[in-house]
């Protein structure tokens, strides 16, 4: 019995790994590059689920990928942060980042209440829009006790909307020729994923890219205090309800902070950093495959339409406000 469980576990790991590798390779192609590997992995898994069904015989490995590997990827994600640069060079952007996060979450929840959409998905989308896309959703979902299906739907929506906006940004820059620093800062503080920021900021040159990454990584840095606020909120909510729930500080958040400190104070060779980045990406992709397998297309259609509309409106408002702010601050 134990050998059967181990075999199921390994087959599940290999299954998610195989689709992750395929998604990683496909994302290197010109057109698919704009979609991103995370979205490709989820779409691939969704199609598999609709056509073939959920592979029950390898569930243990798939469950491991959706839970453990996802948290491991978040821990490694902390190595992208250099707190010295963010607090030193990018303090102006950090102040804007705080406003961006509050604005995104508040507006998303307000709009969702107006159109009576799915609150669980909308709060994940608000966090993903305000902070750092899929990574923020993955990091805060365990704190919020989110369902795996809601996580997968949220990541898919964020990937789609963020990619569309990144392409729109490049078109706007090409047409209106926004000043380099303003454009870089704008992309960094308003686009959803790091990959989307890099895609959009690339057209502005190296100076635009520097400010874009400072703005974006400032939002990643703010994932730490935001997570603490969410933990306190969930504890308060638990104490206020009749059913008491234990809300612990997630170990992966502690790991994320430790990794950020290591990258800030310990020089890491570029070759090693590149290897870690690939491992982080593959772990995240394997987790997205596992989450995508939980999605039933009918549920996506019924649950995702209103949150999709909400996040599009939020993203449009966020883009407009942040462009105005960066134009004033970085003349």
UniProtKB/Swiss-Prot annotation:
One GO CC term on file: plasma membrane
Keywords, sorted A to Z: Cell membrane, Membrane, Transmembrane, Transmembrane helix
Subcellular location, record wording: Cell membrane
Transmembrane segments: 7-26, 31-48, 69-88, 93-115, 122-144, 154-176, 183-205, 249-271, 275-297, 308-330
Source superkingdom: Bacteria
Primary residence: membrane
Similarity remark: Belongs to the UPF0324 family.
Name the UniProt record assigns to this protein: UPF0324 membrane protein SERP0111
Organism of derivation: Staphylococcus epidermidis (strain ATCC 35984 / DSM 28319 / BCRC 17069 / CCUG 31568 / BM 3577 / RP62A)
């Amino acid at each position: 019995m134990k050998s059967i469980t181990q075999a199921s576990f390994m087959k599940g790991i290999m299954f998610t790994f195989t689709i992750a590798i395929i998604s990683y390779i496909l994302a290197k192609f010109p057109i698919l590059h704009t979609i991103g590997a995370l979205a490709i992995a989820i779409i691939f898994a969704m199609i598999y689920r609709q056509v073939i069904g959920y592979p029950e015989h390898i569930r243990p490995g798939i469950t491991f990928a959706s839970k453990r590997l996802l948290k491991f990827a978040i821990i490694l994600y902390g190595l992208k942060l250099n707190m010295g640069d963010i607090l030193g060079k990018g303090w102006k952007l950090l102040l804007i980042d705080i406003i961006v996060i509050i604005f995104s979450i508040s507006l998303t929840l307000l709009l969702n209440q107006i159109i009576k959409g799915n609150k669980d998905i909308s709060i994940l989308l608000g966090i993903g829009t305000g902070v750092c896309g899929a990574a923020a959703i993955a990091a805060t979902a365990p704190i919020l006790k989110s369902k795996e299906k809601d996580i997968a739907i949220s990541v898919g929506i964020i990937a789609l909307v963020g990619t569309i906006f990144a392409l729109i940004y490049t078109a706007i820059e090409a047409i209106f020729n926004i000043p380099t620093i303003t454009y870089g800062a704008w992309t960094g503080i308003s686009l959803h994923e790091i990959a989307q920021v890099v895609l959009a900021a690339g057209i502005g040159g190296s100076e635009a890219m520097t400010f874009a990454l400072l703005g974006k990584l400032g939002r990643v840095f703010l994932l730490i205090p935001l997570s603490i606020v969410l933990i306190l909120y969930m504890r308060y909510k638990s104490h206020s309800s009749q059913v008491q729930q234990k809300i612990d500080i997630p170990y992966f958040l502690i790991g994320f902070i430790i990794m950020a400190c290591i990258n800030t104070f310990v020089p890491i060779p570029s070759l090693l950093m590149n290897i870690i980045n690939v491992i982080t990406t593959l772990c995240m992709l394997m987790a997205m495959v596992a989450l995508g397998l939980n999605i039933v297309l009918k549920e996506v259609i019924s649950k995702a339409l209103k949150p999709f509309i909400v996040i599009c409106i939020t993203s449009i408002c966020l883009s407009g406000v942040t462009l105005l702010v960066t134009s004033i601050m970085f003349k």
